[in-house]
């Protein structure tokens, strides 16, 4: 039925498969930036939290009887830590983007979305394509022009990522300035890859840019990257959260977030809050090694290296696997150019990162198709 499509994917080196990798490989492919996924004491803490309750399953939607004290505690902790009026748990970052875009785009609203926004957001715009306008990646001038051309009486949402998941670029402060000077405009910030990697206390894009006023900001924070768990949370003014609670299909018509994941997120969050300065210092040491060895600045939790074609990219990935390192090989159509995506993780030692950097340096000397992205 799909044989020709699959053959075509094989032909252009875009075929993908699930794979169980050798556990002895050093992991530089995942989004476990702070290395929390291997801390068994935190897993035990999460289990102990859950054991104290009679029920260990969410059972139903949050709007039936699936809302649990652990859910409420996590929402309160995040709202307090990130200084938002209210918070709402969702099942994943994908479901969070779906909730925001499907629900907030009421009849008189427009969405202006960065062209490099996460695939879950771009997919969600297909529900209401006539209300969506894309602007060039991190291009303030292009956004301003499109806002100028839009009807003045419309409610406007601007969707960006704090740190873009495929190129590691950080969204500029200018986006905040735009919503401050534009009537009826709100900023949606997907902080999946910025929370835990940037900011004075690793709290993400808003802290990085020292943004305090959040009455026109909607933040989507996921738990599956730096917090090494699963799920996500929307943080926003109370009225926005109430509206999402009452209208978002991916909140109303789905089972509440797993209680084990919620407990694990709480355990990891508590550790993060207590150790954030030490975690930041350790992450900066790994970043410094990459800069000193490869000349690549890494202000976030990962960096990318561009390749001319898919075979060259896969050859580089194989070369590194033979050296004992697992890195991400990101191919079109996910990205326009093949990218080696190298994630830093505190579960790896500084010596591991030094060895990886040297392996990349060795590869670059023998492969002309390699260049830093």
From Swiss-Prot:
Q: Which residues cross the membrane?
A: none
Task: Name any cofactors this protein relies on.
Answer: pyridoxal 5'-phosphate
Listed GO biological process terms: biotin biosynthetic process
Record keywords, A-Z:
Acyltransferase, Biotin biosynthesis, Pyridoxal phosphate, Transferase
Locate the residues binding substrate.
Answer: 16, 118, 334
| Signal peptide (UniProt feature, chain positions) | none
Positions that bind pyridoxal 5'-phosphate: 93-94, 165, 190-193, 222-225
E.C. number: 2.3.1.47
Residues modified to N6-(pyridoxal phosphate)lysine: 225
* Swiss-Prot/TrEMBL catalytic activity: 6-carboxyhexanoyl-[ACP] + L-alanine + H(+) = (8S)-8-amino-7-oxononanoate + holo-[ACP] + CO2
Cross-referenced InterPro entries, in alphabetical order?
Aminotrans_II_pyridoxalP_BS, Aminotransferase_I/II_large, AON_synthase_class-II, PyrdxlP-dep_Trfase, PyrdxlP-dep_Trfase_major, PyrdxlP-dep_Trfase_small
Q: Which GO terms describe its molecular function?
A: 8-amino-7-oxononanoate synthase activity; pyridoxal phosphate binding
Self-association and partners: Homodimer.
As for what it does, the entry says: Catalyzes the decarboxylative condensation of pimeloyl-[acyl-carrier protein] and L-alanine to produce 8-amino-7-oxononanoate (AON), [acyl-carrier protein], and carbon dioxide.
Family affiliation? Belongs to the class-II pyridoxal-phosphate-dependent aminotransferase family. BioF subfamily.
Know the name of this protein? Answer: 8-amino-7-oxononanoate synthase
Q: What is the native source organism of this protein? A: Helicobacter pylori (strain J99 / ATCC 700824)
